[in-house]
Each structure stands twice: as structure tokens, then as C-alpha cells.
């Protein structure tokens, strides 16, 4: 608890509660009283334990909470990372959800981002060969920029949840429209054998075939020209 006061005096902007201390209510309460942002590690904790820790923080008038999903192990084994809990945390809590990574590489961080985490915590080291459990799973300085760029690429890829203007433009170029196979005279009644389907898709779409069959041509029509509804009469 004394360390909490010391951290606040140093001007820290946030205090991180380790997974091992999620039930250390005196420590959590002291951290909450500082009014600083509380980052709550939840490794090996039940959802009830996470909820009770949040309740303690909130009871001190502090709602500036970030909940970290993390897994046991330095480095963590992939089969123990349990990214699925991120979905539950997002459903239950209104606070930002972070992923505190203990795995080697970047792929699990990318997956966590795709699952909707707001923050990713990754440790940095000057030398992975340093004899300590955390160094092997950390990024070296030269890996930091590619890591951040990968995160930004995924964020950009996830930014849209509907067709973009560019999608619609490309869609019309690659889809097909209804054309005549051969030149046909005005008054000809169109049957399916008269038709073919070619790009682009700016004309009558194949799924609108029922608007064409049985209709008559208003004027002579060349196979070079896209068939239009205005070309047809009953």
C-alpha cells in the first residue's frame, strides 16, 4: 500500500494491479483512492473476482478502469492464452478491455485486436537473450515499428463494416450485364437463347432476367450494345 502512495507522488498517470493481487482489496482500494487510472490484470481470475475488484475501485469514486486479459506463463503457451474470454469481458463490463501479451511473436496480439480489445500491452527489451523469463517473449527495439504497423493495418482493415464507394465501383466493373448474342430486329420477342452475359455490370443484371424474357425489342439492337430496359416493350 505504501508503494501506491509513492507511485502517485512520482507523478504516475496509471497504476497497474497484477493478476496475483486481484483479491488484494486493501491494495486495490488504496490505488483507487489516488484517482489515477487503474489497469487491472485478470490472469487466472474468475469473472466474479474481476467484478468484485471493479466494485472496490468504483466504491472509491474511481471509474477510470482498464481490464486486462492476460494468461499465465513466461512465455505463455498458445493453448493457455484463452482469447475467447475477451468476448465475455466486453459483454459484461463497460470498461476498455486490454490484452496483456505474454506470448512470443505478434500473431496473438493481432488476433486479440480483431476480437475487439482497445489496448495491447507488449513488453520491450534491448536483448532477448538476457537471462530472464520476460525477455524471450519481448520485442527488441527494431521489432517495435513492424509491430505497430501491423496493429495499424488491422485497425484500418476493420474500420469499415459496409461496402465502400470503391467496392461499389469495382463491383460494377467485374459483374455482368445482359447482352444479345446476335443482332436482332425491332419487334423480336426475346427468349433465353437470344441472351449472353458480359462485363461490365452497369446494365440489366442477370438476376433481373425476368424483366427481359418475353419482351420485344423497341428498335434494332446490336450485340455490341448493352441491353437496357428502355430498349424493351411489352
Specify the residue positions occupied by each region the protein language model found:
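Catalytic cores and adjacent flexible loops of soluble metabolic enzymes
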Residues: 1-234
